[in-house]
């Protein structure tokens, strides 16, 4: 069974796929229990001064405060090299393509830039994604005490630090919002399925609960 998760965070000059540029990408791989495998990678990508100067003020201030702009200007790494570095690290821990979901916070935006600029990396990842922000939004609606009690974020706006915070956040939700291992019994699962489908649970339902596809 392939249970690894590939955590990626990107920093860009903005959120417009038509004009903005990818300037930093970091990756960490975890196992199913959210243990980090290896040291991860954090790569700053060079872009020209024209692209940097086109950033809106709030983004330019954020990246200047974090030190990222200076690192972008001094970097000699292009997109192709950055993609290769990230894939080399991931391949050390994920041996089969299209088996590990992409994980992170509001990860759809990051994936859009990855798909545009790093298609080999994008195609290596499973099409499914695990978005921690989705769990956050559900907790806000269903378990507000958990939502308001979540760990404070550092807001560094640097890719690798943001991944560590996302992993910590999911660990928090696992311990507060999810049922503890090993989860409900087979009978309890069958009873919930029966309740949701409006039909009584039968012995066959209970016996076959382990065998149902999880799609």
From Swiss-Prot:
It is found in: Cytoplasm. Residues 5-170 form the Exonuclease domain. SUPFAM superfamilies: Ribonuclease H-like. The keyword Nuclease applies. Transmembrane segments: none annotated. GO terms for molecular function: 3'-5'-RNA exonuclease activity; nucleic acid binding. It comes from the Bacteria. Its EC number is 3.1.15.-. One of its GO terms (cellular component) is cytoplasm. Keywords: Cytoplasm, Exonuclease, Hydrolase, Nuclease. InterPro entries: Exonuclease_RNaseT/DNA_pol3, Oligoribonuclease, RNaseH-like_sf, RNaseH_sf. The active site is at residue 127. Its main location: cytoplasm. Belongs to the oligoribonuclease family. HAMAP family: Oligoribonuclease. 3'-to-5' exoribonuclease specific for small oligoribonucleotides. This is Oligoribonuclease. The lineage of its organism: Bacteria, Bacillati, Actinomycetota, Actinomycetes, Mycobacteriales. The gene is orn.
